[in-house]
Amino acid sequence: MSEEKAVSTEERASRKVRVGYVVSDKMEKTIVVELEDRVKHKLYGKIIRRTTKVKAHDENGVAGVGDRVQLMETRPLSATKHWRLVEVLEKAK
């Protein structure tokens, strides 16, 4: 009797993708990226810019300060690193 194994094709949950600018590349295989979020003020309606700095994994060290990069959320790689570099969208001038 040969039984066929049920192949489970579980989809991964959708991961967050963000675009930001590299503000530091002094660590090995790690870059610090500033992400900008625009929110509307609850009462006055003015658009406010909020920025967050996150650490991202850059395996090959291709990103430099000032580069515009695309990040994707990933499993925790260290205590503070939860993002990885997908691609460099635009090199710094």
Swiss-Prot record:
Keyword RNA-binding carried by entry: yes
Keyword Nucleotidyltransferase included in the entry's annotation: no
GO process annotations (BP): translation
CDD domains in UniProt: Ribosomal_uS17
Molecular function terms from GO: rRNA binding; structural constituent of ribosome
Record's GO cellular component terms: cytosolic small ribosomal subunit
Gene3D superfamilies attached to this UniProt entry: Nucleic acid-binding proteins
Keywords: Ribonucleoprotein, Ribosomal protein, RNA-binding, rRNA-binding
Residues in coiled coil: none
Quaternary structure annotation from Swiss-Prot or TrEMBL: Part of the 30S ribosomal subunit.
Role according to the record: One of the primary rRNA binding proteins, it binds specifically to the 5'-end of 16S ribosomal RNA.
Family statement drawn from the similarity comment of this UniProt entry: Belongs to the universal ribosomal protein uS17 family.
Stated name of the protein: Small ribosomal subunit protein uS17
Biological source species: Rhodococcus erythropolis (strain PR4 / NBRC 100887)
